[in-house]
Amino acid sequence: MAAVDSFYLLYREIARSCNCYIEALALVGAWYTARKSITVVCDFYSLIRLHFIPRLVSRADLIKQYGRWAVVSGATDGIGRAYAEELASRGLNIVLISRSQEKLQMVAKDIADTYKVETDIIVADFSSGREIYDMIREALQDRDIGILVNNVGVFYPYPQYFTQVSEDTLWDIVNVNIAAASLMVHIVLPGMVERKKGAIVTISSGSCCKPTPQLAAFSASKAYLDHFSRALQYEYASKGIFVQSLIPFYVATNVATPGSFLHKCPWLVPSPKVYAHHAVSTLGISKRTTGYWSHSIQFLFAQYMPEWLWVWGANILNRSLRKEALSCKA
């Protein structure tokens, strides 16, 4: 009995001496909870401010804000074409750049007829290296370029392990995903700085959020574009230039395999037209955004989840996409 009493007294003494530590831990827990709560509220406010409020107010005058002409690379399909059409719907004249003259002429005519704006085309294969840029520079030199959209890019035929990717594809990723955006900015930025206004939109990818297995080179090239855009914003914001890093997740383009299960979730995987309509409304508001409300929710989850969980999910998704692509080939 005496032993029990002694233990009870000892326990009380230890508990009394630990009270200050328990209170300190409670304060730390309260601070952490408050901080996370404030972060969630701020993220929710940002989501509303970016993706819903702009749809309730009158559209910004992009011509007055940036200039009369927009240049869109990779403009004959997918996000590039949809973005060009959305800018044209707001009255901007469009210079379309892509490698297929036939497609360029068709898209340029469609845009001119539908939106009653001027269009021009530049036939350029960005995978051919530096030789095309003098021609592009000459074609754009007399234009009042207000907006540059760096959309052109190449993707793997389907998710693959790095050693399975061909050397040609790796060179295309360097030349098209990385070099094209860098050199297009180098061409148009001096004119924007001289006029003290302009916008540069560079389309990265949600795969740049964290290391993405089976898309190693592609996701790394998109991470370059994200960091490049953010650094440019810091360099040139004081000169009147708005630089936006656009980080879409899956959009229903050729990148998401036609017939894929991804196309069955339109609220999660929007059409290029829907995506571009939302993305353009964020221009001038957010320097770094996914461009679409459900993608912003995905981006928030990606930011907060541990890297191992991202890698696990990416492996499952990319294995499914590879299996589906290979079964379609068979």
Swiss-Prot record:
Binding positions (NADP(+)): G74, A75, T76, D77, G78, I79, G80, D125, K222
Keywords: Acetylation, Mitochondrion, NADP
GO cellular component: a single term: mitochondrion
Top-level taxon: Eukaryota
UniProt cross-references to CDD domains, sorted A to Z: 17beta-HSD1_like_SDR_c
Leader peptide range in chain numbering: none
Residues found modified as N-acetylalanine: A2
Pfam families recorded: adh_short (PF00106)
Disulfide cross-links: none
Ranges where the record places region Required for mitochondria translocation: 2-82
Annotated compartments: Mitochondrion
Entry annotated with the keyword Cell membrane: no
InterPro entries cross-referenced by the UniProt entry: 17-beta-HSD3-like, NAD(P)-bd_dom_sf, SDR_fam
PANTHER family: INACTIVE HYDROXYSTEROID DEHYDROGENASE-LIKE PROTEIN 1
Record note on quaternary structure: Interacts with STYXL1.
UniProt similarity note: Belongs to the short-chain dehydrogenases/reductases (SDR) family. 17-beta-HSD 3 subfamily.
Protein name in the entry: Inactive hydroxysteroid dehydrogenase-like protein 1
The gene coding this protein: HSDL1
